[in-house]
Amino acid sequence: MYYPFVRKALFQLDPERAHEVTFQQLRRVTGTPLEMLVRQKVPARPVTCMGLTFKNPLGLAAGLDKNGECIDALGAMGFGSIEIGTVTPRPQPGNDKPRIFRLVDAEGLINRMGFNNHGVDNLVENVKKAHFDGVLGINIGKNKDTPVEHGKDDYLICMEKVYPYAGYIAINISSPNTPGLRTLQYGEALDDLLSGIKNKQLELQQKHQKYVPVAVKIAPDLLPEELIQVADSLVRHNIDGVIATNTTLDRSLVQGMKHCDETGGLSGRPLQLKSTEIIRMLSAELNGRLPIIGVGGIDSVIAAREKIAAGASLVQIYSGFIFKGPPLIKEIVTHI
C-alpha cells in the first residue's frame, strides 16, 4: 500500500540517485532485525528447474543488486531467486553519467550502465555474509577493456571465484552497453565460449564436489535464424538453461517519448511482447531440451503467465519492480 508514496518521492530524483538512496536504506536493514520492515509473506510455489528447487517461480533479474549488497533484504520481500551482478573480474566504473532514463508514460527504462561494479572479489565477500534461503544466481560478464577475443578468459575467472557460492551462474553475452559483447552470441565465438565454460564447469564440479548449473542470457534482438543457431549451440554444449531476454535496442514502441533516443538498452513494458515472442520461438526450437527463464517487461500476473504460457519455467522482474514495488512480488507469486 505504501509503495506509490515511496515511488512518488523516488521519482523526483535522478534514476541512479533514487537507486543509491534505496540501496542505502536496504543496506541498513539487510542482515538486521529491521529486515522485518521489508519482509512480506508469500505462498510456497515450489518449482524444480536446472536441477534446483526454487521456493517459487519468481526471481529478481540481474542488474539491480550488482554487487550482492542487499541479498537478504531483497530476499525478505518474497523472491524465490535473486540474480546478482553483472560482475566482472576487476572493478570498473561503467559508462559516464547520466546513464539511466525513465520513460514514465511507457513504464520503461533505458540504461547504458556498462557493467559498473566493484569486482568479483567484493561480490564474493558480500555473498559470504548473506543468509538468503532461496536460489542465488550470479551473473558474470567481461571487463570493458578486455578485448572481445579474450573475453572468454574473464568469464572463466569469474566462474572460478563464484562457483562455490552460486546456486546457478548466468553468462551475460547480451548487454548492449559493452562494446562488442553481443558478438559472442554468434557462430564460432559462441561455440568457443560455451566450450570453455562447459569444460570449466566440469573441472569445478570435480574440485568442489557439487554441480552448479550454467544459464546463458540472450538478447531480444536476435533474428529467427540467429535464435535457431543459439539454441543449437546451447543444446550441443549441454548448457543448463537460457535466460530470455536482456534489454532491447528497438525503439519502435516508444517513438516520440521523452528520452526515447538515448543510447542504451530498453526494458520494461515496451519489451514485454518482444521478449515473450523470443521465448515462444526459443521454446519451439528447444522442445523441452533445456529450461527457459523468462524476463522482459513483466509488470503483472498476466504478463508473468504469458511468459510461462510461451514456454518459460521461471520468470524474473526488474523494471516492473521499479514501477510497481514489492506488492508486485506478492501479487505474482500468489496468483501465478
From Swiss-Prot:
The annotated pathway is: Pyrimidine metabolism; UMP biosynthesis via de novo pathway; orotate from (S)-dihydroorotate (quinone route): step 1/1
The positions annotated for binding FMN are A62, G63, L64, D65, K66, T86, N139, N172, K217, T245, G268, G297, Y318, S319
Specify which residues bind substrate according to the UniProt entry for this protein. K66, N111, R112, M113, G114, F115, N172, N177, N246, T247
What topology in the membrane does the UniProt record assign? Answer: Peripheral membrane protein
Q: Which CDD domains match?
A: DHOD_2_like
Pfam families this protein is in?
Answer: DHO_dh (PF01180)
The Gene Ontology CC terms held by the record are: cytoplasm; plasma membrane
Q: How does it assemble?
A: Monomer.
Q: What function does this protein fulfil?
A: Catalyzes the conversion of dihydroorotate to orotate with quinone as electron acceptor.
Q: What is this protein called?
A: Dihydroorotate dehydrogenase (quinone)
Q: Which organism is it from?
A: Klebsiella pneumoniae (strain 342)
Q: What is the lineage of its organism?
A: Bacteria, Pseudomonadati, Pseudomonadota, Gammaproteobacteria, Enterobacterales
